[in-house]
UniProtKB/Swiss-Prot annotation:
It comes from Mus musculus (Mouse). Residues 1-28, 78-93, 166-198, 260-268 are extracellular. The keyword Iron-sulfur does not apply. One of its GO terms (cellular component) is membrane. The lineage of its organism: Eukaryota, Metazoa, Chordata, Craniata, Vertebrata. Its main location: membrane. GO terms for molecular function: G protein-coupled receptor activity; olfactory receptor activity. It holds the Pfam family 7tm_4. GO terms for biological process: G protein-coupled receptor signaling pathway; sensory perception of smell. The chain crosses the membrane at residues 29-49, 57-77, 94-114, 145-165, 199-219, 240-259, 269-289. This is Olfactory receptor 5K17. The gene is Or5k17. The keyword Cell membrane applies.
């Protein structure tokens, strides 16, 4: 009975960044600023898309959901990491660990599906512009978003449930700044064969499907763009896809570096920082700064707020 209950009472110690105690104040301030900007940027983008009717299109529906998932990823990782900079023992309970992993897995799985959906949306817009409203309707984009959240939740629940079957008795020290699946396997005294099998059965097909969708979509886009005779048409097509292509490239490069085999565990921390903290910070700016529709929507909201503020001041006087 004691052995069966062992995994229910275990606590872990997150030792990521513990080698940089002299920089803990600087790192705390840096990551606090990143966290604040990430949450404001992503939730601000979600609010903007919700409030502006002109942004109620498939591309922005996917973008709003991506921003929501980036906020989820940041909220799952950063608060505990900030707490640990000044924590004496750096402990995290099994329950907290599973919750953190669940939301991280949910966010990253949803990101994969959403980036693939956005690539398909760009493919339809550039390669089949006359059929865009029938092939990629608002209703279909909402259905795809709902399907993404259902699939991502199921994927997260499967892996979290499999983690709970493990007994952790080798060590409590996780050589990372958050609870992730592979570092937890190293601490298990239960054979993680079933867990690893679930990775091959569920995670690998998701990666293959989403990466293939992105690659095929952009291959078709490039072929279509190179066939265009108009330079203006080419420029418009490239500018339409540039932000998404850049975002999806850094996401998958970091993902493949992070999940790839490595003998040096210290490599996982900087790649993990970029993958889970920096990318959610960059995405709202990548998609917004050169996007005229988003910039115009921001100006409209600011103008409306300014008019409302001036009207309120006039009434008060």
């Amino acid at each position: 009975m004691m052995k069966a209950n062992h995994s229910l009472t275990v606590e872990f110690i997150l030792i990521g960044f513990s080698d940089h105690t002299d920089l803990k104040t600087l790192l705390f301030l840096l990551f606090s600023a990143i966290y604040l900007v990430t949450i404001v940027g992503n939730l601000g983008l979600v609010a903007l898309i919700y409030m502006e009717p002109r942004l109620h299109t498939p591309m922005y529906i996917f973008l709003g959901n991506l921003a929501l998932m980036d906020s989820c990823c940041s909220c799952a990782i950063t608060p505990k990491m900030l707490e640990n900079f000044f924590s004496v023992d750096r402990r995290i309970s099994l329950y907290e660990c599973m919750v953190q992993f669940y939301f991280l897995c949910l966010a990253e799985t949803a990101d994969c599906f959403l980036l693939a959906a956005m690539a398909y949306d760009r493919y339809v817009a550039i390669c089949n512009p006359l059929q865009y409203h029938t092939m990629m309707s608002k209703k279909l984009s909402i259905q795809m978003s709902i399907g993404t959240f259902i699939a991502s939740n199921l994927h997260s629940l499967i892996h979290t449930g499999c983690l709970l079957r493990l007994n952790f008795c080798k060590s409590r020290r996780i050589d990372h700044f958050f609870c992730d699946i592979l570092p937890l396997y190293k601490l298990s005294c239960t054979d993680p064969f079933i867990n690893e099998l679930m990775l091959y059965i569920f995670s690998m097909p998701i990666q293959v499907f989403t990466i293939t969708t992105v690659l095929v979509s952009y291959s078709c886009i490039l072929l279509t763009v190179f066939k265009m005779k108009s330079k203006d048409g080419r420029g418009k097509a490239f500018s339409t896809c540039a932000s998404h292509f850049f975002s999806v490239s850094i996401f998958y490069i970091c993902l493949l570096m992070y999940i790839g085999p490595s003998k040096n565990s210290n490599k996982d921390i900087p790649v993990g920082v970029f993958y889970t903290i920096v990318i959610p910070l960059l995405n709202p700016f990548i998609y917004s700064l050169r996007n005229k529709e988003v910039v115009n929507a921001v100006k409209k909201v600011m103008k409306t707020h300014s008019i409302f503020k001036n009207s309120s001041a006039s009434i008060a006087h």
